[in-house]
UniProtKB/Swiss-Prot annotation:
GO cellular component: cytosol
PANTHER family the record matches: LEUCINE--TRNA LIGASE, MITOCHONDRIAL (PTHR43740:SF2), LEUCYL-TRNA SYNTHETASE (PTHR43740)
Organism phylogeny: Bacteria, Pseudomonadati, Campylobacterota, Epsilonproteobacteria, Campylobacterales
Protein family (similarity comment): Belongs to the class-I aminoacyl-tRNA synthetase family.
NCBIfam families: leuS_bact
Key word Protein biosynthesis present: yes
Chain positions recorded as ATP binding sites: 582
Protein name: Leucine--tRNA ligase
Protein location: Cytoplasm
HAMAP family xrefs: Leu_tRNA_synth_B (MF_00049_B)
Reactions accelerated catalytically: tRNA(Leu) + L-leucine + ATP = L-leucyl-tRNA(Leu) + AMP + diphosphate
Gene symbol of the encoding locus: leuS
UniProt xrefs under Gene3D superfamilies: 3.10.20.590, HUPs (3.40.50.620), Isoleucyl-tRNA Synthetase, Domain 1 (1.10.730.10)
Length: 809
């Protein structure tokens, strides 16, 4: 009977569905595994990147179910966001309709691949019930001071008419639509992620060896802890009069280089710069250039060519008394440190580049024979008055102590990470559950009024926020004073939704109506044992999710410190050397692959083509090869003896049979390492192929039965439909249990040894594994007699189980 993928796959998907095979068990005393792949945005169709992500997670989930774990393997949809509004404009369809139609289609696609997701715990973040508890979290965080309002410069996308977080600006453009981003001053809500900066940094230690080093480094750099000196510099008298300021604060991590300061660089937003601008003390050209810098995102400022302008004012060096010119510069950020940088060109590459460009003084204060800038934090100080000849570290500590003693400076810790702006001026998002009252100011909604849902009678035009234009939706009564008030019309950044969905999945779905998170369930299931997703989420989603876990812990919802125990970042799927995209015309439709070859072929190719963490190059021939392997497996299974296994005795097998059995058990041994540790599915599949090839040379019915029993177990998480089908035919599915290694199979009857003479290989021979060292050496000499003739052996070396080396002269 020929292999018919479609019939087999539909049959088993129906059986699994009817028997709720993949729902987590209610018994919370069982050992558990929570396997989670990052959920998709419902764009309309899944792509090969999704297939790869979910195949990896599904293989792990199926494996752990098979060996007796209670497995939670959920899926949902990150369903709020700007693309739905863009689609509404383009296709004249409501964002909600577009979103839920896409979800319905993508659900069919996902289950057609045999993914073992829990259907009962499926959710969309745009569901009112999800919004309700998200709004509850927002209010609780607001009441605790973890969310606040302020007016600040924000990244503004003119195309999408919304605010973007720093992390959502890529090369000066919107990460979603690619449009230019400008700076705009606006009021908004901010999440105080900086309150957890120290803990977020410290707890990265817990994730070492469990998360990719690259992700840990990216997060460490983004948090950006630096310890240093914050100190005051007085302005000279003329500058005081111009700026209406008497001094400015500066932060430095290199107090040891303070005598090398040749200029102070200020952010364009610094109060001193703004005072000069307000008094028209800068010419129009400088004014225009400062405004241009202000329109750059923080990331652009850091990466673009260094630019600056002398402000015509001076500060006084606090120790030497020298006058230091003040410049405005594009590389200084207003919200890092004090928005002012002490520049030491001799010992900092950026400062050196700037000083060279504008012909500013370069003062060396650390002794070195190397070319400047010398940026190492080691060496003896020079030109530093009483601190000369001290090494850098000692000088740094003494200089800080002197500043503290004079009460003009102090030790401080700074972080690069900024508070997270979550206000978005768009319709298709979770409404911010706050009220603006003329009498009371900003007031939270009452919890019993949640969820605050979106009105459906809106016009999506792409111009401004539709909620602002709605005739009645904003109108409400202030819960504090009872007067007329207005709802907040901004909606939440969609990263707010994806920052806690994993905890919602961990809650028993029977409690979803009553509470955000079920204490008993989340205590059992959290943290996620294995999280799988792209490296592109290293900073955005993964950092926000870590913050949410800690904030919800402190609010009493969760108990764990970290949301994800282990993290796997899978590589991209490429075709013709480039990431698949419609614009490049290199997209492969998963539906077409399933229709032509079946889901198991797609799954097998995805896991065999490359290790999960590496990029995967799509190859049509390799897909054909995966299909042929499954056909071959199916065809050969038709000749395997059905029923109970016959016990094999190792001593009764011939050489070829022992070798084939060894290859089968080597594959089994590898499966334990792959499923538990390395996820190198490609090597496991290769080991199974090798075992089947060795088995083809044998004519032992009982051995073939045992081999298929084991190999179907190994491959079931990877190609489940065909393995369930064959296991039902051959073993009535009784093989789905934990398999154990038989160590006697790994004991070899014979050894294959190499013989070297003076380090050069001369012969190979086979000998019984029970042979003594003396017998092995004698056999080695016999096999190399022609090279030993007329020579004397001065040394005999035997490396057990590997080789013999004879040293002659």
């Amino acid at each position: 009977m020929a292999y018919e993928a479609s019939l087999i796959e539909k049959k088993w998907q129906k059986i699994w569905d009817e028997n709720e095979y993949f729902e987590p068990k209610d018994d919370l005393n069982l050992p558990k595994k929570y396997i989670l792949s990052m959920f998709p945005y419902p764009s309309g169709r899944i792509h090969m990147g999704h297939v790869r992500n979910y195949t990896i997670g599904d293989a792990l989930a199926r494996y752990y179910r098979k060996i007796g774990f209670n497995v939670l393997h959920p899926i949902g949809f990150d369903s709020f966001g700007m693309p739905a509004e863009n689609a509404a404009i383009k296709h004249k369809i409501h964002p909600k309709s577009w979103t839920y139609e896409n979800i319905a289609y993508m659900k069919k696609e996902l289950f057609s691949l045999g993914f073992s997701f829990s259907k009962k715990r499926m959710l969309a973040t745009s569901d009112p019930l999800y919004t309700k508890f998200e709004q509850e979290f927002f209010i609780k965080m607001f009441e605790k001071g973890l969310i606040y309002t302020k007016e600040a410069n924000v990244n503004w996308c003119e195309q999408d008419q919304t605010v973007l977080a720093n992390e959502q600006v890529e090369d000066g453009k919107c990460w979603r639509c690619g449009h230019e981003v400008v700076q705009k001053k606006m009021p908004g809500y901010y999440v105080k992620i900086t309150a957890y900066a120290e803990e977020l940094l410290k707890d990265l230690e817990e994730l070492k060896d469990k998360w990719p080093n690259q992700v840990l480094t990216m997060q460490e750099n983004w948090i950006g802890k630096s310890e240093g000196l914050e100190f005051s510099l007085n302005l000279d008298e003329e500058s005081k009069q111009k700026t209406k300021e008497s001094s400015l604060e500066v932060f430095t991590t290199r107090a040891d280089t303070i005598y090398g300061v040749s200029y102070i660089a200020l952010a364009p937003e610094h109060k001193i710069v703004q005072n000069l601008l307000s008094q028209n003390l800068l010419n129009q050209d400088v004014l225009n250039k400062i405004k241009a810098i202000q329109n750059q995102s923080p990331r652009e400022r850091q990466s673009s060519e260094k630019e600056g302008y002398f402000l015509g004012i001076y500060a006084i060096h606090p120790l030497s008394g020298e006058k230091i010119p003040l410049w405005v510069a594009n590389f200084v950020l207003a919200d890092y440190g004090s928005g002012a940088v002490m520049a030491v060109p001799a010992h900092d590459e950026r400062d050196f580049e700037f000083a060279t460009k504008y012909n500013l003084a370069i003062k060396q204060v650390i002794q070195t024979q190397e070319n400047l800038p010398y940026t190492q934090k080691s060496g003896k100080l020079i030109h530093s008055q009483e601190f000369d000849n001290l090494d850098c570290n000692e000088a740094r500590l003494k200089i800080i102590s002197q500043f503290e003693a004079k009460n003009i400076g102090k030790r401080v810790v700074n972080f690069k990470i900024r508070d997270w702006g979550v206000s978005r001026q768009r319709y298709w998002g979770a409404p911010i559950p706050m009220i603006k009252c003329q009498s009371c100011g900003i007031v939270p909604q009452k919890l019993e009024n949640l969820p605050i849902t979106l009105p459906e009678d809106v016009q999506i035009t792409g111009e401004g926020n539709p909620l602002d234009k709605h005739p009645t939706w904003k109108n409400c009564i202030c819960p504090k004073c009872g007067k007329e008030a207005q709802k907040e019309s901004d909606t939440l950044d969609t990263f707010f939704e994806s920052s806690w969905y994993f905890a919602r999945f961990a809650s028993d779905e029977k409690t979803w109506q009553e509470k955000a998170l079920d204490e008993k369930s989340v205590k059992y299931w959290m943290s996620v044992d294995q999280y799988i997703g792209g490296i592109e989420h290293a900073i955005l989603h993964l950092l926000y999710a870590r913050f949410f876990q800690k904030a919800l812990r402190d609010l009493g919802y969760l108990t764990q410190n970290e949301p994800f125990d282990r993290l796997l970042t899978q590589g991209m799927v490429l075709k013709d050397g480039a990431k698949m995209s419609k614009s490049k015309g290199n997209v492969v439709d998963p539906d077409e692959i399933i229709e032509k070859y079946g889901a198991d072929t797609a799954r097998l190719f995805i896991l065999f083509a490359a290790p999960p963490a590496k990029e995967l190059e799509w190859n049509d021939d390799a897909v054909e090869g995966a299909y042929r392997f499954i056909c071959k497996l199916y065809d050969r299974a038709q000749n395997v003896k059905k029923g109970e296994l016959v016990e094999l005795k190792q001593e009764n097998l011939n050489k070829e049979e022992k070798y084939a059995r060894l290859k089968v058990y080597e594959a089994l041994k590898k499966s334990f390492e792959v499923y538990h540790q390395s996820f190198a599915f490609n090597t496991l599949i290769a080991a199974c192929m090798e075992a089947l090839n060795a088995l083809a040379l044998c004519k032992n019915e009982a051995l073939e039965q045992e081999a298929f029993y084991i190999i179907l177990n190994i491959l079931e998480p990877i190609i489940p439909h065909v393995c369930f089908e064959l296991s039902e035919e051959l073993f009535k599915c009784k093989n789905f249990k934990k398999l154990e290694l038989k160590e006697e199979i790994f004991v070899k009857d014979t050894l294959n040894l190499a013989v070297s003479i003076n380090g050069k290989k001369r012969a190979e021979f086979e000998i019984s594994s029970s042979a003594s060292k003396e017998e092995i050496l004698a056999f080695a000499k016999e096999n190399t007699a022609k090279w030993l003739e007329g020579k004397s052996i001065v040394k005999e070396i035997y490396v057990e189980g590997k080789l013999v080396n004879l040293v002659i002269k």
